[in-house]
Amino acid sequence: MANAHDTHHEGNHGSVKSYMIGFILSIILTAIPFGLAMSPSLPKNLTVLIIVAMAVIQVVVHLVYFLHMDRSKEQRNNVWTFLFTTLVIALLVGLSLWIMFSIHFEMLAK
């Protein structure tokens, strides 16, 4: 009974090198938008586009280097769960905004 918890599933844990690469990429992907916001040398639309692109890339970096999501068989369930969660959140936010805008326009018409 004392050894009931001896079975551990060894997942793909990252190495120090992997974590350092992820950390350095995260710093770079944070510094670029910060620099663009602090010194507005580009047009506003381009700045916003670059900041959004850096945010999306940073999400991917975090998923790969810190959450260890990849295309391996062991991570397949985690990837599908993440994709489903992303879909549900996108639907929740998108449809909520659609409802609020519809209500707003209906209130203006009266």
UniProtKB/Swiss-Prot annotation:
Periplasmic-side stretches of the chain, per the record, are 40-46, 100-110
Q: Look up the record and report any one GO term of the cellular component aspect.
A: cytochrome o ubiquinol oxidase complex
Residues on the membrane's Cytoplasmic side span: 1-18, 68-78
Spell out the protein name for this chain: Cytochrome bo(3) ubiquinol oxidase subunit 4
Which family does the similarity line name? Answer: Belongs to the cytochrome c oxidase bacterial subunit 4 family.
Principal location listed in the UniProt entry: membrane
- Membrane topology designation: Multi-pass membrane protein
- InterPro entries the UniProt entry points to: Cyt_c_oxidase_su4_prok, Cyt_o_ubiqinol_oxidase_su4, Cytochrome_c_oxidase_bac_sub4
What residue ranges are annotated as transmembrane?
19-39, 47-67, 79-99
Q: Which UniProt keywords are present, listed alphabetically? A: Cell inner membrane, Cell membrane, Electron transport, Membrane, Oxidoreductase, Transmembrane, Transmembrane helix, Transport
UniProt record, GO biological process: aerobic electron transport chain; electron transport coupled proton transport
- State the protein's purpose: Cytochrome bo(3) ubiquinol terminal oxidase is the component of the aerobic respiratory chain of E.coli that predominates when cells are grown at high aeration. Has proton pump activity across the membrane in addition to electron transfer, pumping 2 protons/electron.
Q: Where in the cell is it found?
A: Cell inner membrane
Per UniProt, subunit arrangement is: Heterooctamer of two A chains, two B chains, two C chains and two D chains.
> A single GO molecular function, which one?
cytochrome bo3 ubiquinol oxidase activity
One Pfam family here: COX4_pro
